[in-house]
A protein has these predicted regions:
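Charged catalytic cores and adjacent phosphate/nucleic-acid-binding surfaces used
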Residues: 2-168
Length: 168
């Protein structure tokens, strides 16, 4: 998509959000970011999202490198859309061997960075263990079902504790 077409779409609000990190290289994304910054300086405000899809995940070269963090009230389609529309989203890219980069309003970036440093890796460890047990179950491990059942709800409990929802 040409810069002029992107500009026309964003200036006329034909899109609900701008896929800021949609390329597969720093070069492609740098141009998108520069265009977005230019539009912001001209008064055009539009929410950002990271990559909306991944191609060629077999070798995983580009899989999971670009993402969107959305601060929605609930994990529902409507709440996610509403959060993005109100600029409660952050575009993020993370290339192998490099520090991640976050793009959005300062407040959103600061919170996303905090979660990246203190929450996401711990949450991922819990999910990894559940995934490992699911794989073992499918492979015929007779004990995996009981161990998986014991893990049930641990990610929800962790999130509730981390965000102070379990304190009454």
């Amino acid at each position: 998509v040409t810069d002029s077409m992107t500009r026309m779409y964003l200036e006329n609000h034909y899109a609900d959000a701008f896929e800021l990190i949609g390329g597969q290289s720093n070069h492609e994304n740098m141009l998108q970011i520069a265009l977005y910054q230019q539009l912001l300086s001209e008064g055009c405000r539009i929410p950002v999202v990271g990559n909306s899809d991944s191609h060629g995940t077999v070798d995983r070269v580009y899989f999971n490198g670009m993402k969107t963090i959305v601060f929605a009230k609930e994990n529902t389609k409507d709440d996610i859309i509403e959060a993005v529309r109100h600029e409660y989203s952050v575009a993020m890219d993370e290339y192998p061997g490099q520090e991640p980069r976050f793009y959005a309003a300062f407040r959103m970036v600061r919170y996303a960075l905090f979660l990246y440093e203190h929450y996401f890796s711990l949450h991922a460890e819990l999910c990894f263990e559940e995934g490992r047990l699911m794989r073992a179950l499918v492979a015929g491990d007779s004990d995996a079902a009981a161990r998986l059942s014991a893990c049930s709800g641990q990610t929800g409990c962790f999130a509730a504790h981390f965000f102070g929802r379990d304190m009454k």
